[in-house]
Amino acid sequence: MRILGIETSCDETGVAIYDDEKGLLAHQLYSQVKLHADYGGVVPELASRDHVKKTIPLIQAALNDAGMTKDDIDGIAYTAGPGLVGALLVGSTIGRSIAYAWDVPAIPVHHMEGHLLAPMLEDNPPEFPFVALLVSGGHTLMVEVKGIGDYQILGESVDDAAGEAFDKTAKLMGLDYPGGPRLSKLAEAGVKGRFKFPRPMTDRPGLDFSFSGLKTFAANTIRANDDDEQTRADIAFAFQEAVADTLAIKCRRALKQTGMKRLVMAGGVSANTYLRQELEAMMKKIGGEVFYPRTEFCTDNGAMIAYAGMQRLKNGETTDLAVQAKPRWPIDQLAPIK
């Protein structure tokens, strides 16, 4: 079975083809970073228009890479949500239309389930059950995962997501878009211990997150200190350290609460090297394992959507002719795969 996956939930256009026997056959990705850079963030209308231009050519490129035609495809998986409504409508309309034209099933996929299952594309995938930390620009979720679709949300951000806090703090420091990776790069030159940032919501029980106060603390620290390069690097280091420590503390709590020893981290922020090192050290101490996708599959991509769609189609899940786009869609509303 071969599934073509389409991802257009935000500012990346991703298309991939996944074979249930041979694995990933093709992977095409176009990033809109340059398009949005002048605005300091994603402009939804521009994102939607660019998806319109790029999706069909990327589908053809993926077919060419795999040496296939439309007749070799058994289903179309597309991101139905959550995400920017206009961007979602582009991918879902194209996906649903192509499925109708090619006479194959269409499978709407939850964007965060795609991220959660992205480590399954690796040579050493995690076994169920596990705890998943989903960290991106729009979401920070702690999820107990007993199987595909069998999800219980243990904690989530009550305000800014971790990736959003990275981007906003980077903007406060005058760093160009996309700010998160640039802040992490600046932090590499930082000195540990010069600044001490709080670890929000770690002084109380629970697994929810809050990063808006950390952003405010960063703003006050920036205003109170010199603007030389070393000071900027030290502030960036302290901020990144605080986010990583907070996530690690919450992960350890979640693992203790569930009695699990396997941790999956996915989403755009999971590409952060410092965060990976923190979680690896924490899991080593407790005798557990941590899994995450390769860097190119941490950010939005079509491969994770094709894989998730494959699992849903095998479970007999398809849709009628209606185009599905759900800007808000809690992951624990998904049906478990039997």
From Swiss-Prot:
EC number: 2.3.1.234
Alphabetized UniProt keyword annotations: Acyltransferase, Cytoplasm, Iron, Metal-binding, Transferase, tRNA processing
Enzyme class label: transferase
GO MF annotation: an example: iron ion binding
Cofactor: Fe(2+)
Sequence positions that bind Fe cation: 111, 115, 300
Tree of life domain: Bacteria
Gene3D superfamilies, per the entry: 3.30.420.40
Binding annotation for substrate: 134-138, 167, 180, 272
Any GO BP: tRNA threonylcarbamoyladenosine modification
Transmembrane segments: none
CDD domains (UniProt xref): ASKHA_NBD_TsaD_bac
Localization per record: Cytoplasm
Cofactor: binding details: Binds 1 Fe(2+) ion per subunit.
Reactions that this protein is recorded to catalyse: L-threonylcarbamoyladenylate + adenosine(37) in tRNA = N(6)-L-threonylcarbamoyladenosine(37) in tRNA + AMP + H(+)
GO cellular component: cytoplasm
SUPFAM superfamilies on file: Actin-like ATPase domain
Family membership noted in the UniProt record: Belongs to the KAE1 / TsaD family.
Biological role: Required for the formation of a threonylcarbamoyl group on adenosine at position 37 (t(6)A37) in tRNAs that read codons beginning with adenine. Is involved in the transfer of the threonylcarbamoyl moiety of threonylcarbamoyl-AMP (TC-AMP) to the N6 group of A37, together with TsaE and TsaB. TsaD likely plays a direct catalytic role in this reaction.
Name of this chain's protein: tRNA N6-adenosine threonylcarbamoyltransferase
